[in-house]
């Protein structure tokens, strides 16, 4: 049998021909960044520059960090990590007295490389002290519109899907989205006293025609439904705010005042792509410690490793004012505003394979 012909490898990004094709997108990226910095300045935000090297990279089960060592002059090594978000540092600044702060910088996440993921990427994160979380929602929607204005497009586009950044935003709760797109009554499976009922959720999944593995817990099933049935249907035609996450998935968000089953956590989608993740921020240090413990126990079970807690962060959280915050994937925003298909098309220098 003759060998099948194969395509030659793609030219590196630094070859003149490839760079010539990429350059218009990269220049658009710079213009979007300038416009967003202008918006933040108009809103009286202070730009801050948190260090990437941290004692703890973050304490979420499924986020994987790059580990390194910090070696002192005496040769003693201390474990350090590249942060997965500047959140801990920025909340320390809120505790110190800053009121409106923003950071546009690189973050690192291991085990992530795909059309929508890059191991080193640019995150825009900002916080407003003494502000409801709807305020940072509004900030983000305005920035999405700015990106479209700067690139001169009326629709955000990604792989055949479109979203109008100027149309009225769809805001729905996670429970509403599960009912609408999967036919699942999520709140019926949540009990703040006895814990979430994984078997109730599994039964609804089977009724909806979704496969259920032999070994499961509630959080795993929730994530499966969200990624397979819900997320691909969000932000189609217009931008979607997915709000009021289950309290068990609150991460660093406070519980909703009107329903302890859900939290002030939201995500923003366009063209089926998650662009941003925001919170009405939790300021209860002991509750945050409890949540981190649960996350790291599960991480140890699944991946055989856990990250240390940042005790300084927990101390700062105890004196931090009420606040709202949000993290926006800047590269993804550029990708949708320019119609790029892969995230590597919108970064000046991709990480080497």
Which residues are covered by each model-predicted region?
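Metal-assisted phosphate- and nucleotidyl-transfer catalytic regions
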Residues: 146-272, 294-320
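Conserved structured core elements
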Residues: 26-30, 34, 42, 47, ...
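Active-site pocket scaffolds in enzymes
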Residues: 285-353
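A generic structural signal for well-ordered coil/turn residues at beta-strand boundaries
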Residues: 62, 78, 98, 117-123, ...
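Class II aminoacyl-tRNA synthetase-like tRNA-binding/catalytic domains
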Residues: 2-135, 143-145, 231, 335
């Amino acid at each position: 049998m003759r060998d099948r012909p194969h395509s030659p490898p793609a030219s590196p990004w630094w070859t003149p021909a490839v760079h010539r094709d990429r350059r218009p997108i990269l220049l658009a990226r710079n213009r979007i960044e300038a416009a967003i910095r202008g918006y933040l300045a108009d809103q009286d935000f202070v730009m801050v520059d948190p260090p990437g090297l941290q004692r703890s990279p973050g304490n979420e089960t499924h986020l994987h960090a790059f580990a390194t060592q910090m070696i002192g002059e005496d040769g003693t090594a201390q474990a350090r990590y590249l942060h997965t978000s500047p959140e801990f540092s920025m909340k320390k600044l809120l505790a110190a007295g800053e009121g409106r702060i923003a950071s546009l910088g690189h973050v690192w996440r291991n085990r992530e490389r795909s059309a929508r993921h890059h191991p080193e990427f640019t995150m825009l994160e900002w916080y407003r002290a003494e502000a409801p979380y709807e305020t940072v929602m509004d900030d983000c929607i305005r920035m999405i519109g700015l990106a479209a204005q700067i690139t001169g497009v009326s629709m955000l586009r990604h792989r055949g899907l479109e979203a109008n950044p100027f149309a009225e935003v769809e805001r729905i709760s996670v429970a509403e989205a599960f009912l609408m797109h999967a036919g699942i009554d999520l709140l019926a499976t949540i009990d703040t006293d006895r814990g979430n009922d994984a078997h109730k959720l599994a039964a609804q999944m089977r009724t909806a025609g979704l496969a259920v593995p032999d070994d499961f817990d509630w959080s795993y099933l929730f994530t499966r439904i969200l990624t397979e049935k819900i997320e691909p249907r969000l932000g189609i035609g217009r931008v979607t705010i997915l709000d009021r996450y289950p309290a068990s998935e609150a991460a660093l968000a406070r519980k909703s005042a009107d329903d302890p089953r859900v939290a002030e956590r939201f995500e923003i989608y366009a063209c089926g792509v998650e662009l941003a993740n925001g919170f009405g921020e939790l300021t209860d240090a002991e509750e945050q410690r409890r949540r981190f413990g649960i996350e790291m126990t599960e991480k140890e079970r699944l991946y055989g490793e856990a990250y240390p807690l940042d005790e300084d962060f927990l101390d700062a959280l105890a004196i931090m004012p009420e606040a709202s915050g949000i993290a926006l994937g800047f590269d993804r925003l550029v990708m949708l505003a320019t119609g790029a298909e892969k995230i590597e098309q919108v970064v000046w220098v991709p990480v080497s394979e």
